[in-house]
């Protein structure tokens, strides 16, 4: 199964601490981990229906880099499914290497916002 292989390969690159954080996620929650770029290793919990991302200090996820728009993107939760939506940002939002307006996220997939490469991990209880 491709998605299981993807999950396993991403899990192998996680530190013990990151793996424990992913394993502990309650149902309906997800985690973004900065894999490359500024703040590498930073973790962001997705635990609400809408999580804003941007360079604005009031953003739920504050990414302090000029490649990130003040109001860049939103992560949305619908049941146990998550998606990312670009908010007409200057540099766009990429999902698995392609610029997108919005995309439904799958476990282990990569979202790029500015210089930040974030890997999405869903709760194991929802996979």
Regions found by a protein language model. Give the residues of each.
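Residue-level detector of flexible, active-site-proximal loop/helix-junction positions
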Residues: 39, 91, 99, 124-125
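Forkhead-associated
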Residues: 45-119
């Amino acid at each position: 199964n491709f998605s299981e292989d993807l999950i396993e390969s991403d899990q192998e690159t996680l530190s013990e601490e990151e793996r424990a954080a992913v394993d502990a996620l309650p149902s309906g929650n997800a985690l973004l981990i900065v894999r490359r770029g500024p703040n590498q290793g930073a973790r962001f919990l997705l635990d609400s229906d809408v999580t804003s991302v941007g360079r604005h200090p009031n953003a739920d996820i504050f990414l302090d880099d000029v490649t990130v728009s003040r109001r860049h993107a939103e992560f949305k939760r619908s049941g146990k499914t998550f998606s990312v939506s670009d908010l007409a940002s200057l540099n766009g939002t990429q999902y698995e290497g392609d610029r997108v307006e919005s995309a439904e996220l799958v476990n282990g997939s990569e979202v790029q916002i500015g210089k930040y490469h974030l890997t999405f991990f869903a709760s194991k209880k929802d996979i």
